[in-house]
């Protein structure tokens, strides 16, 4: 995988790397301290960096803001279905959501619930415990279908019945 980070010049001095490498206190610094700090972390195959322009072009050509909006809409719609089925209050307002949501589940054992989702329904999603509660987190990307969300909802309903 690859990612890129854009930071305005005037803010670059305030952004520090989470992991430091050879550029941190380089004996031969480059023209940009920001690049020295962030660009190179150890031995790396540089071919991933070369894919970034094509990825940005792909996002532009496929109207990614609209794709993202539709994904978020699906997250909100299905979260409402989860909340209605579980008869729980919404953990947060809809406008806090992006393309991901966490649903509190009335189960005590997150590991077993996750294992049952995978082994019985072939569904892989994060199920985790936080502050003595169990949560299921799902995210929607362009390649996800409504059928997959319906399958997840049905599986959760069956496991909780």
Question: What do these predicted ranges mean?
Answer:
Residues 7, 103-107, 140:
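Short beta-strand-to-loop capping motifs
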Residues 49-52, 79, 110, 114, ...:
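A general structural signal for well-ordered alpha-helical segments in protein cores
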Residues 115-161:
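PLP-dependent enzyme catalytic core of the Aspartate aminotransferase-like
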Residues 72-76, 85-120:
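Conserved PLP-binding catalytic core of the aspartate aminotransferase-like
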Residues 17-60:
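PLP-dependent aminotransferase class I/II
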Residues 49, 53-90:
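Conserved PLP-dependent catalytic core of the aminotransferase class-I/II
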């Amino acid at each position: 995988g690859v990612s890129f980070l854009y930071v305005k010049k005037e803010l670059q001095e305030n952004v520090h790397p989470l992991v430091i490498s050879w550029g941190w206190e380089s004996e031969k610094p480059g023209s940009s301290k920001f690049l020295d700090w962030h660009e190179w972390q150890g031995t790396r195959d540089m071919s991933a960096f070369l894919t970034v322009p094509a990825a940005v072009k792909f996002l532009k050509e496929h109207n990614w803001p609209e794709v993202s909006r539709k994904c978020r809409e699906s997250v909100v719609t299905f979260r409402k279905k989860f909340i209605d089925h579980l008869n729980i209050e919404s953990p947060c307002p809809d406008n806090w959501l992006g393309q991901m949501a966490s649903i509190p589940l009335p189960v005590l054992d997150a590991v077993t619930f996750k294992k049952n989702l995978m082994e019985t329904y072939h569904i892989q999603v994060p199920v985790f415990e936080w502050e003595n509660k169990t949560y299921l987190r799902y995210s929607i990307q362009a390649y996800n279908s409504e059928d997959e969300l319906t399958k997840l909802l049905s599986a959760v309903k069956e496991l909780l019945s």
